[in-house]
């Protein structure tokens, strides 16, 4: 089976808790290789553009404000069924509904400050990866 790529963002709340290493360990234990990574402080323009699909939703402004509230860790994960596998280990969007042992159950505080973002489809993964990384930044692992 071909390996997929997916985008993951460790959000400002989880970065502030210093759990990046613990989250990376979960990716690797699930068979997801990190093939690109960077820490950055998103600008308002970047966050608005990245989450443009949600622009008409009532939570858009709060989402953007949260995503620019502190640094984020952005990584590209590679592995078999990477999109689905990453979403499984992230857990439900609302941490109160997330299964025990998932990233959100263990590290998220609320549906807004929910620790991580993960691509929800191969198509969105390709778009999201291209938003943050140039092709030459992806390492072959």
UniProtKB/Swiss-Prot annotation:
EC numbers for this chain: 2.7.4.6
Cofactor dependency: Mg(2+)
Subcellular location: Cytoplasm
Keyword Transport: no
GO MF terms held by the record: ATP binding; metal ion binding; nucleoside diphosphate kinase activity
Keywords, in A-Z order: ATP-binding, Cytoplasm, Kinase, Magnesium, Metal-binding, Nucleotide metabolism, Nucleotide-binding, Phosphoprotein, Transferase
Keyword Transferase recorded: yes
Family: Belongs to the NDK family.
Name of the protein: Nucleoside diphosphate kinase
Classification of source organism: Bacteria, Pseudomonadati, Pseudomonadota, Gammaproteobacteria, Legionellales
């Amino acid at each position: 089976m071909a390996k997929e790529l997916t985008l993951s963002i460790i959000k400002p709340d989880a970065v502030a808790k210093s759990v990046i290493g613990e989250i990376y360990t979960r990716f690797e234990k699930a068979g997801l290789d990190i093939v690109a990574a960077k820490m950055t402080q998103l600008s308002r323009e970047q966050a608005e553009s990245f989450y443009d699909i949600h622009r008409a939703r009532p939570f858009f402004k709060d989402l953007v404000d949260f995503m620019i509230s502190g640094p984020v860790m952005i990584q590209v994960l590679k592995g078999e069924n990477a999109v689905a596998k990453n979403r499984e280990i992230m857990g439900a969007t609302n941490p109160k509904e997330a299964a025990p042992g998932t990233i959100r159950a263990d590290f998220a505080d609320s549906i807004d400050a929910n620790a991580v973002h993960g691509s929800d489809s191969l198509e969105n993964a390709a778009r999201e990866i291209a938003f943050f990384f140039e092709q030459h930044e992806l390492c072959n692992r």
